[in-house]
Amino acid sequence: MAPRAAGGAPLSARAAAASPPPFQTPPRCPVPLLLLLLLGAARAGALEIQRRFPSPTPTNNFALDGAAGTVYLAAVNRLYQLSGANLSLEAEAAVGPVPDSPLCHAPQLPQASCEHPRRLTDNYNKILQLDPGQGLVVVCGSIYQGFCQLRRRGNISAVAVRFPPAAPPAEPVTVFPSMLNVAANHPNASTVGLVLPPAAGAGGSRLLVGATYTGYGSSFFPRNRSLEDHRFENTPEIAIRSLDTRGDLAKLFTFDLNPSDDNILKIKQGAKEQHKLGFVSAFLHPSDPPPGAQSYAYLALNSEARAGDKESQARSLLARICLPHGAGGDAKKLTESYIQLGLQCAGGAGRGDLYSRLVSVFPARERLFAVFERPQGSPAARAAPAALCAFRFADVRAAIRAARTACFVEPAPDVVAVLDSVVQGTGPACERKLNIQLQPEQLDCGAAHLQHPLSILQPLKATPVFRAPGLTSVAVASVNNYTAVFLGTVNGRLLKINLNESMQVVSRRVVTVAYGEPVHHVMQFDPADSGYLYLMTSHQMARVKVAACNVHSTCGDCVGAADAYCGWCALETRCTLQQDCTNSSQQHFWTSASEGPSRCPAMTVLPSEIDVRQEYPGMILQISGSLPSLSGMEMACDYGNNIRTVARVPGPAFGHQIAYCNLLPRDQFPPFPPNQDHVTVEMSVRVNGRNIVKANFTIYDCSRTAQVYPHTACTSCLSAQWPCFWCSQQHSCVSNQSRCEASPNPTSPQDCPRTLLSPLAPVPTGGSQNILVPLANTAFFQGAALECSFGLEEIFEAVWVNESVVRCDQVVLHTTRKSQVFPLSLQLKGRPARFLDSPEPMTVMVYNCAMGSPDCSQCLGREDLGHLCMWSDGCRLRGPLQPMAGTCPAPEIHAIEPLSGPLDGGTLLTIRGRNLGRRLSDVAHGVWIGGVACEPLPDRYTVSEEIVCVTGPAPGPLSGVVTVNASKEGKSRDRFSYVLPLVHSLEPTMGPKAGGTRITIHGNDLHVGSELQVLVNDTDPCTELMRTDTSIACTMPEGALPAPVPVCVRFERRGCVHGNLTFWYMQNPVITAISPRRSPVSGGRTITVAGERFHMVQNVSMAVHHIGREPTLCKVLNSTLITCPSPGALSNASAPVDFFINGRAYADEVAVAEELLDPEEAQRGSRFRLDYLPNPQFSTAKREKWIKHHPGEPLTLVIHKEQDSLGLQSHEYRVKIGQVSCDIQIVSDRIIHCSVNESLGAAVGQLPITIQVGNFNQTIATLQLGGSETAIIVSIVICSVLLLLSVVALFVFCTKSRRAERYWQKTLLQMEEMESQIREEIRKGFAELQTDMTDLTKELNRSQGIPFLEYKHFVTRTFFPKCSSLYEERYVLPSQTLNSQGSSQAQETHPLLGEWKIPESCRPNMEEGISLFSSLLNNKHFLIVFVHALEQQKDFAVRDRCSLASLLTIALHGKLEYYTSIMKELLVDLIDASAAKNPKLMLRRTESVVEKMLTNWMSICMYSCLRETVGEPFFLLLCAIKQQINKGSIDAITGKARYTLSEEWLLRENIEAKPRNLNVSFQGCGMDSLSVRAMDTDTLTQVKEKILEAFCKNVPYSQWPRAEDVDLEWFASSTQSYILRDLDDTSVVEDGRKKLNTLAHYKIPEGASLAMSLIDKKDNTLGRVKDLDTEKYFHLVLPTDELAEPKKSHRQSHRKKVLPEIYLTRLLSTKGTLQKFLDDLFKAILSIREDKPPLAVKYFFDFLEEQAEKRGISDPDTLHIWKTNSLPLRFWVNILKNPQFVFDIDKTDHIDACLSVIAQAFIDACSISDLQLGKDSPTNKLLYAKEIPEYRKIVQRYYKQIQDMTPLSEQEMNAHLAEESRKYQNEFNTNVAMAEIYKYAKRYRPQIMAALEANPTARRTQLQHKFEQVVALMEDNIYECYSEA
């Protein structure tokens, strides 16, 4: 594509002129708001807007940097650098406004001074060009006489080269005005620029500039009579300037590339008026010439020639300049090669319309496409204002060569002229050069010795290719034998037309880019991806996808759309761009639109009709159309519902392909639809997992034909479209004639036995008669037994009368209706529903005279129907011999309507009554109005009840009664009148041609007749008629043209009523602008609508699309102004606005013309939009809610307004105090002043202060009124009362203070005593615990003493802590018995640790499927899409996410480096999502798959640290907690203990426990007796547990016997022993509850001998102690003790009771005792071993810091939170709370509570927020409040040490991870994990497939096909296999 340059002129002069002066363009929305409103994509047909960037100021130019993927956008006062892909802002620079004057030199000119005032001036960009060779962006604006800057490529905000360059004072740089005056210095003057590449061996780049002259004498020069013109001498119209920044900077922007004025083209001063040049574009062609080829620079421009010039001279010009080529090429002067020729775009086929003004050009490879428009004001401009023409560059070249030949060889003054009269040239006219042979280069580029510059007088002509109104820009691409043309419009739309090779339009589409904003005349394709087009409107930059092919779902639609870009991707069965289709470069893989729909894949199935009862070996498929060879591909025939059979392709044949396919199994045939004898089956050929072509075949069943058509069974069988045969004897339809018996059978439908139609007389109800039924073709069933059926349960016998007649005997039918028709059919006797054919069914009518005939006329009138009825006090049946009754009574007329009619007659008169004739003939000539006959209408006559007749003409006005004569005469009470209606006038007499005008026609007697018509122009009805006696109102239809039309009033479709009525259709009203364009969301703001011809508007309303509430009614002020209250809206947004004028939707005529190009676009958008913003908010100045005011005093309110963007004016505010208005005096942006000038009333009261804006009302305060005397009295009383209260309070305070002092001293003494006791208790407890723990530490064997879980059990417990979709975790162990060593091995089981249990029959397929699925999971693209697809499902709960993450960790455990890369990618997505909201909340919970993956990754990586460093101090802390708890009393029922860290588990009773040292032996253990310490308050179960702990302390807990599995026996003496139990007959009962037995209860002394033994059968009489019912049992404390009131029973009153809170000091005691062990643990966790640094932590923390830096997150608190959430809170807190994940121990509820307190302290230590502690703070936070600051320092030091570690490379980390994988390989069965992951894949298979289809990489690598293969392998038997397993 050739680079081009755009001028900085306004986008459209027509658009600029459309707005009248009072309505200037309103301020634009700020960028963030517009981004919110406009970033959504819009789509229409085959165009799709991908991205938009809104500009607050009008846009001027843009440039593309294809190599860097950058867009540079220039707007008024701003420069933007945007990302090319999404138009996001990368950099920006402010370049205005600046103080400037067009009469002053640029301030960059040294010693420049100016006497004229400089005013703040906006900077309009004129040139924006990229110079990639020097890394520059050339930016020229309208300020400072068109000054240019050289900015840095890649950073538009930085200036790359300072110009003029700075120089030392000793050597000043010479700067001339011509170096500064580059571009035009007026906003509306055009400028184009083009960076010319340097010639080989030459210097730097050059800049070609074309600029409209703005100096003295032009319309752009200031009209101040100043002659000071800096433009003429310094700014030529066309010039080539230096851009060489690597050479002498002092020569930048100079002309002197060669020392001659010929290097510029400057129009002479005297010729400037006649040659005003307006530049459109500058471009190179060819843009990339081959080496040695000539390249040209072109300028497209308009020459505004004045009247008097030659009529034939074209106004649109194309100028060409030669550029140097090759190393030896000389740089020619500009004027040497300059030549211009006219471009003329004129209508063909006899149309003389000329499009003379050039608007936009686009150079294609062979053609120059140009948009032209007619001059403004042309009479035809409204019909077709713009056209597209195409000129061949070859024709341009030929015309130039011919012109130079005509100038120098054989001069022809009518062909070419020298521009010497216009510019400084080399001679006034062409002259013949003798003895000179012009070389081709001279013919193309001229020479110094030849006349120049030249102008070709005859224009190059072209016929319009396309016409449309308001075209502003063009871009063209040649694609797939089509030419795709994109056209911008003045109304902000983009048209896309596709031209064939003959340049004829074959399709068109329209999309709205920014309605109402003209599209800039330059559009460019993305250099990196031609599938996108960049364009610019007045306030937006847009990136448009050239085609949205995916809107077409079939090949026919895709190819038939004739879109140059779209084609059918055969093997992917979708409409795509060619580059989006795999293998599209190969033949037949991609079918373009140019190939036509006939090349679409098609298929024929043979046989196409299949008998359901016949066996078929297979199907033959003939596949035609554009398809690659299917031979060797994986193929199947797909019948739907997952039914597929194998297909085979032997090879191509005769231009198509043949395939063979097995028919689907018979048991899988689809069911036949109801009442149908066939079913159509759609069969598709499936290739590589996709159905690429389909066809239908039919399965038929002849036997169903007879069932579907039972009354024409034989006829339907033999006339069916299938080969069916009729068996007469079986009365059945078969597909094989051999199934019929040998008897003769009919062979054609005409031979079928059938009943013949025979008319039957009506039968009275209940009568008996015989019915004869004639038959035909009876030879096939002569003599067969038949029955007569009438559709009832009752069947009548049929008797053969002869060979062709059957009689139905004694048929009796009944009905309760007036009459009822019964169908008559013959069926085979004893074979229901087997009927003889009845092609024309016989029927029997049964009537009932007693029903439906309330009067005589109706009764006797039934005789015409064959009903034998008579009238005798009612309608009755008469016998066949009874005579007819006589005449009926005279007619009775109840009502007539209407009561009047015109003299011409024709009125439909309706007469209602009784006995109005028995038949029409009775009254046919018997209806009269006076002496005028009224003719009844047969089709409107109702026997006896109603007559509708047409009145005849009357000789004159008359009035008479209506007479009906039906053998007797009846007359009406009302009179009917003949009158003469007249019309006089109509109003209004004019209206818009859009229709909707409500007119009123005045006259007399206009209410007459039955039908009224008002016709406009004799054809179009005036609708919504309403009439009175003197007027008719109706709504005018739409008119075709502005013209007068006659209006005709017709009564009864007769002639027009006399009176000449004329209505004038006028041009429609035009709306040009609305202001303001912002409204509060509540609506009601007055919107002023400006336009023309509003005097014809009767009513107008305003409605808002999508978010608007009810439309609002507007008010017409005059012919140019309308005011409308803005409608309320549902939300804050920008929405299109519609106006309804006279009930018709307003439409701009130009927009309507555009919409006709694409009817879909007619429904899109509106020209006007309203931006809805939040309602304004107000308050009083001091935000008080009550304001006091004394009547008589002046009242001035100061109201504060919150800042908003509504731009409200002072008259839009209404402030009221009660019902009194407050006059607004001062309004600023934030403050409103108002005052009240009238009295508010003297009565004391309260008045609301309300402020109103539109429909929004806000009460901001209440005004309190009161008298001044009353206020003084009230103040005195209040002060007196306050003084008295102060004295009393002072006395009370002194008394209380003395008492409090005494109490405080007493309390201090108590606290000192308590503190002393606590210190002593801690000292003793710590000493004891240290002694015990020292002994324990000595006993621990470093390798075996700590019961660490194996790695695999650590992993399963950590990954699946509670339950997952895989299994519900239960650590259930078999019954254990101690062996001689006192231990029993019981291995914990888990599905992931065992074999994959599936039956052998299923194993091969499933193992292959799992293997393939494993390879998919090891594909990064698949796994990322897979995880995201599942997480998007609403029913994919957190539990499922965690389960999936853990299963993935197990499945990928052998590839931790790959697992880590996946986790990082998912984390990046999570960080992106969190960074956009609140980054500090990231990783706070575990709610996504990646968060659980991170937990698992940390668990794996930290296991070694956990086991080698943290495990021992952690285990010692657990033992210390247990030892400390066991030193005091523990309530076995409630679990509460004397010593604890948790307030909830504190035993708040002072129960003294004494230790007992017991000598215990364990029978069968093989160990000596041990001394075990217990407390005398221990229950026997607690004693057993302590004994078991003593004997099994070096054995894992899972191998311990349980307390209920052993008995404890006390040997009180050598002869006495007792089995000790918690409950027995000796248990004590208190308050109805049994107390558990303790050592004290049994009075077991110190040193007692006990024996413990295993029991064979567990005693189930007593369950777990803590599960006992507290209503029946207790241990230490009755359940009511802790909740009881101070009053107790006498029996309990001896207990010493104190406040329960006093025992909270024991928490401190326990904490102090355990402090050392806790400190050791925290230091182990938060320290770094030099020999084994935490590589994973360093790696992950560095990753977090890198991500934060990428997103500009510099807050250290955020990084601290991320690190804390990822390691301490995610891993260590989990371990601290769950020691059973690490050790094989018993975690009791009490230990769990203590660990929760410790974990909370760890969490607080990692937090950065200060602890807000008070008296109500929980004890678990207060307990370690003093230590938290020290712990925090340790945490921060740990983070700092991690940060200071040497960074890890990816290779080092991968090596570490690989080592971790190797260390624990083969620990888990990954097949089980894969199978469980597959269950999720199966559950969400459609969603996963859709996600894979939507992912380009997945489509390219066919991941969806591989996934389908997994499903195919797994689906057939996975569930059966699992059920068997």
Swiss-Prot record:
Gene3D superfamilies assigned to the protein according to its UniProt record, in alphabetical order: GTPase Activation - p120gap, domain 1, Immunoglobulins, Phosphatidylinositol 3-kinase Catalytic Subunit, Chain A, domain 1, YVTN repeat-like/Quinoprotein amine dehydrogenase
Subcellular location field: Cell membrane; Cell projection, Lamellipodium membrane
Protein name as catalogued: Plexin-D1
Domain IPT/TIG residues, every copy: 891-979, 981-1066, 1069-1160
Topology class, membrane: Single-pass membrane protein
Domain Sema: 47-546
Residue numbers spanned by region Disordered: 1-23
GO biological process: angiogenesis; aorta development; branching involved in blood vessel morphogenesis; cardiac septum development; coronary vasculature development; dichotomous subdivision of terminal units involved in salivary gland branching; endothelial cell migration; kidney development
Signal peptide range in chain numbering: 1-46
Segments crossing the lipid bilayer: 1272-1292
Family: Belongs to the plexin family.
GO MF annotation: an example: protein domain specific binding
Keywords: Angiogenesis, Cell membrane, Cell projection, Developmental protein, Disease variant, Disulfide bond, Glycoprotein, Membrane, Receptor, Repeat, Signal, Transmembrane, Transmembrane helix
Glycosylated sites: 86, 155, 188, 224, 481, 500, 583, 696, 736, 802, 965, 1017, 1060, 1099, 1118, 1132, 1237, 1257
